[in-house]
A protein has these predicted regions:
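Surface-exposed, charged/polar loop-rich segments
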Residues: 1, 92-100, 104-119, 132, ...
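Charge-rich, intrinsically disordered regulatory segments
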Residues: 5, 9-16, 50, 67, ...
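Basic, short loop/linker segments at the boundary and entry of helix-turn-helix/winged-helix-like folds
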Residues: 8-47, 131
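Active-site beta-loop-alpha junctions of metal-dependent nucleic acid enzymes
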Residues: 29-37, 156-157, 178-201
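Short, charged amphipathic recognition helices of the HTH superfamily
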Residues: 51-62
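Short, basic interhelical loop/turn and adjoining N-cap
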Residues: 63-77
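Conserved beta-strand -> loop -> alpha-helix junction used to position metal-binding or nucleic-acid-contacting
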Residues: 76-79, 172, 176-178, 207-215, ...
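Structured nucleic-acid-interacting core domains from mobile-element enzymes and related host factors
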Residues: 85-161, 167-168, 288-293, 304, ...
């Protein structure tokens, strides 16, 4: 194309179109100069990223909102680039420093936020512990029994995630603080447990459930000497194939051992049965079984059922917390991103607790019988715990009193329960002791002592004795819906991200627009009126000029160097080498597993 300028005008003198391509208006949106992200798109991406929504899902939602790809002014790569830029801006001072700044901001918002960072001689982060104010308050009510585990390793530095998990009045898992560790040795666990102990006002839990890790056991004995410590039963039984598969009669050994572990009513029954079991299958030289027997008081149910464990016999509550992070966390996740997702977990758990509180107080689960005792628990317990009580009432139908012995003070009932499991059935005899003068009751199954729920055998005897109201000692305040709990008055988390002034104004205006739009959309006339008003406003010179001025000022502010105070320039941790756990065997998120399959 040739152009000639004549008298302040450009004249086209010739055009050669040999090198031109056909015009394609529909593809013009893909030209880089035509692609852009407006404020609404950026805000959506930011909020979704904070909530842990993956970018591909955020992009799909924007496509649906626009009515198709062809209606967007950007492509998925633009969205990824924007989020990547935002994340880099947040962590430009380094991951370690960013984590410290985040924790410091949390403490400024609530002085009861607790954190400690352990650093190596090079000023790099080694270990981290933190707990928000709500978790600290919740510990005072539900910190009697906790589960602790370190199986989840998905983050940029391969640092194990170590949550302290309790059980609230709805039976929900509740977070009571957590750590990220550089090692899984005794000294590291001692550091973490001491941090947690200081955080909780030097109050130790009454019981703690862990796996068989010797380093954990040593640390617990040192930091929590008066705390009951039990091993995860599920992990032990899961190892049976690995430890016993070499024996020719493995299936028979496995069946006998399971029956011995789960069916032994007393310690004497277990010990005599174990000796017979070892001798019968010639297992005297099996070191693993020998170690298990030496530590039987840590894992065999009949040794542990007399103490309160809130129903916990495994660490699966700790491992269950990992499911929340699945899909949001991967091997490139920074420490700060991990902590943000942890905050999301806190908010999610708190919301579920609020909903369960509301449901328990404002709705009623009908009784399944005419029992006065069932009605008593209906009035006192949360829905979840009352549901457990109702299950015992239903199972009471499988119980029958076979014999009664009175010694002049107390009455001993022999209650036979018909048990059905899959295609097998069996009878189990329980001894229930009832004191007519005090109405106290005690069952050999120890469900009340272990779980805090009156068992079916006791309910059978109470009905036999025509007891219509149980003592308050059998109605645990821990499961009550009538108690106002202090931790529920504390916010679960605080947003430390400081939005730019124009973003705050944008959010404020959007909320106003949504309210007006909801009113206007009720009729066509209202819609037409609002559209006319908006079009008139968009042409208003004062609004356009003010917006341009504000945008220029915003750009000037964005170029201003960060003047935040640095805290000794804390460095990011080094990549952790797993001791005794090969990296290839670490627990991975579903996202990583799918990614590996695609690359095979």
């Amino acid at each position: 194309m040739t152009a000639v300028r004549k008298q302040d005008m450009w004249m086209i003198s010739s055009v050669v179109d040999e090198h031109n391509h056909d015009v394609s208006p529909t593809k013009s949106r893909l030209i880089r100069g035509n692609r852009k992200l407006n404020m609404q798109v950026k805000r959506t991406l930011d909020l979704n990223d904070q909530a842990g929504v993956r970018i591909n899902k955020s992009f799909r939602s924007l496509v649906c909102d626009a009515g198709g790809f062809e209606n967007l002014q950007f492509v998925e790569r633009d969205a990824r680039n924007y989020i990547g830029k935002q994340r880099r801006a947040l962590g430009k001072e380094g991951d370690g420093q960013a984590l410290l700044n985040h924790f410091s901001a949390m403490r400024e918002l609530n002085k009861d936020f607790f954190f400690e960072i352990d650093m190596d001689p090079d000023n790099r982060i080694s270990n981290v512990f933190w707990a928000d104010a709500r978790s600290r308050a919740a510990f005072m009510e539900f910190g009697d029994v906790v589960s602790f585990d370190t199986t989840y390793l998905t983050n940029k530095y391969d640092m194990p995630f170590a949550p302290f998990v309790g059980v609230n009045h709805h039976g929900h898992s509740i977070l009571l603080g957590c750590g990220l560790l550089s090692a899984e040795d005794s000294s590291t666990f001692v550091w973490l447990f001491r941090c947690w102990l200081r955080c909780m006002g030097n109050k130790s839990p009454e019981g703690i459930v862990t796996d068989q890790c010797k380093a954990m056991q040593n640390a617990i004995q040192m930091v929590f000497p008066n705390t009951r410590h039990r091993w995860c039963l599920w992990h032990i039984m899961k190892k049976l194939p690995e430890k016993l598969i070499g024996y020719t009669n493995y299936k028979e050994i496995k069946h006998t051992m399971k029956q011995l572990v789960y069916e032994s009513s007393t310690a004497e029954d277990f010990e005599s049965g174990w000796n017979n079991f070892i001798e019968l299958y010639d297992l005297e030289l099996n070191e693993w079984l020998h170690t298990l027997f030496e530590e039987r008081h840590r894992w065999v149910p009949c040794y542990l059922k007399c103490d309160f464990w809130a129903g916990m016999s495994t660490t699966q509550r700790s491992e269950g917390m990992n499911a929340f992070f699945d899909g949001f966390i991967n091997s490139t996740t920074t420490l700060q991103q991990f902590v943000v997702q942890y905050d999301n977990a806190l908010r999610s758990k708190a919301e579920k607790e609020y909903e369960a509180d509301f449901s328990s107080v404002n709705t009623t689960i009908p009784c399944g019988s005419q029992s006065f005792i069932e009605r008593q628990f209906q009035e006192e317990y949360t829905h979840a715990k009352f549901g457990e009580v109702q299950n015992e009432f239903r199972c009471k139908m499988n119980c029958n009193v076979k014999n009664v012995v009175f010694d002049g003070i107390r009455t001993k009932y022999f209650v036979k329960e018909a048990l059905i499991w899959k295609d097998e059935s069996a009878d189990k005899m329980r001894e229930v002791i009832f004191d007519p003068s005090t109405k106290d009751i005690e069952c050999s199954c120890r469900l009340f002592e272990f779980r805090g729920i009156l068992c079916r055998h006791s309910l059978m005897v109470l009905a036999q004795e025509d007891v219509r109201c149980v003592s308050q000692k059998y109605i645990l305040g821990r499961w009550s819906k009538q108690i106002r709990r202090w931790h529920t008055l504390i916010r679960a988390s605080y947003n430390t991200k400081k939005d730019e002034p124009n973003v705050k104004r944008y959010d404020f205006l959007c909320k106003k627009f949504y309210d007006i739009a909801e009113l206007a959309c009720e009729s066509q006339s209202g819609t037409d009126f609002l559209v006319d008003q908006l079009e008139s406003l968009s042409k208003n010179a004062s609004i356009r000029d003010a917006g341009a001025t504000s945008l220029g000022a915003q750009k000037d502010m964005s170029s201003t160097p960060n003047t935040a105070v640095e805290h000794n320039n804390i460095l990011s941790p080094v990549h952790v080498k797993r001791k005794g756990r090969p990296r290839g065997l670490r627990m991975q998120s579903t996202v990583e597993k799918i990614g590996k399959k695609k690359n095979m």
